[in-house]
Amino acid sequence: PRFEDVPAAVEKRIVEDVENVFYPTKPVVPFLDIVHDRAVLELFRGCTRGCRFCQAGMLYRPVREKTPERLLQIAKDTIANTGYNEISLMSLSSADYSKLPELVDMLMEEFKDKQVSVSLPSLRIDSFSIDIAKKVQQVRKSGLTFAPEAGTQRMRDVINKGVSEEDLLAACTNAFKSGWNTVKLYFMMGLPTETDEDLAGIADLAYKVLDLHRDITGKRNGSVTVSVSFFVPKTHSPYQWYGQQDVEEIHRKQRYLKSLINNRNISYHYHDGYTGYMEAAFARGDRRLSKVLVKAWEAGCKFDGWTEFFNYETWLKAFADCGLDPAYFARRTRDFDEPLPWDHLDCTVSKAFLKREWEQAVDANLTSDCRRGPCKGCNVCPELNTAIIDYKEGGRVEKVTFGLK
């Protein structure tokens, strides 16, 4: 620290009682259309599924749920104040909310005569409920989105996704039998230990889902959208030490996967490799990159999250003008003992736990969810003197865990 009154490490703070925390039920409603033009209902905070690529799953631990009654009141107030006609149930893994069936019933009953729909984000395959999906589609029908994340079981185990091909096909079977014809699948490319066989598994899964629709319905009007993002290693996650793959290699993989998908009923979308490269540089960068941001802005970089505004050469020049190389931050695999630029930001998940998870990933071993199972020793609960709050057994359950340094 540069000043005596500044602590060496800044520890995160959390809201222990999410039930009674302030919630913005009177948001500003713009006159023009925006991306998330709907009411948002936060079911709970935190996620302990333990996906190794996920920064948010580490940062926002532990899980703390709200009651259905509190959520219903928030929804009623927000709709009354905004006039929105859609409520999105948002959390890191919304389908894991212990009282989701009860909440959906309450929302549908409350808004059945007001043409207010309820929507769910992309769903975990292993917590998907066709009954809930059918209920939320009563007002406004849409496609279903699942997130297998990887094409082979080995790769899904590496990232600790904890779902199988059988889980995906079972979920799609239920969906197709219930009248859905469209499914969207989310994947990532460039993950640690990934091979071309794992990429081929993405195409293979897409074809299996499409064939499943034809077998169940006897029709050829099914469609599958395959959306593949470029993996960006994030701080405070087990992959914070991992160097991102070269952009040229990612482009090769994108072409390879595209060559395997030759069906008009399968749409293939992928993210720009150069944008992902810049994201990785800033995701694992240090304070020197603040000068790069200023240089890029002075050179005209604005709204660069949109590909039509993104100018890769301008960003490279901004780095060069500051005497820096983005590859140093994005592509370099760091040593376990190396001090990290973000070590002074303490999210209370111990570095020892993240190292163990990296080692588990290399061996393709799964780590189970501590939400309703044994503690995995991430250190969050004892460090913050807090507990997991879950309503699965009916009433409020506060599960206290321990830490392993």
Feature map (PLM): residue ranges:
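Glycine- and acidic
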Residues: 36-40, 52-62, 84-92, 151-158, ...
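Acidic, low-complexity intrinsically disordered segments
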Residues: 1-56, 61-63, 69, 305-345, ...
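Short, glycine-/Ser/Thr-/acidic-enriched flexible segments
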Residues: 26-28, 45-49, 58-61, 78, ...
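Cysteine-cluster motifs in flexible loop/terminal segments that predominantly coordinate metals
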Residues: 54, 334-404
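Ferredoxin-type iron-sulfur electron-transfer modules in oxidoreductases and energy-metabolism complexes
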Residues: 30-31, 66-76, 80, 103, ...
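Terminal amphipathic helices with adjacent charged low-complexity linkers/tails
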Residues: 3-13, 63-67, 74, 94, ...
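Flexible glycine/acidic-rich beta-alpha junction loops that bind and position SAM and/or redox cofactors
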Residues: 49, 98, 128-132, 154-159, ...
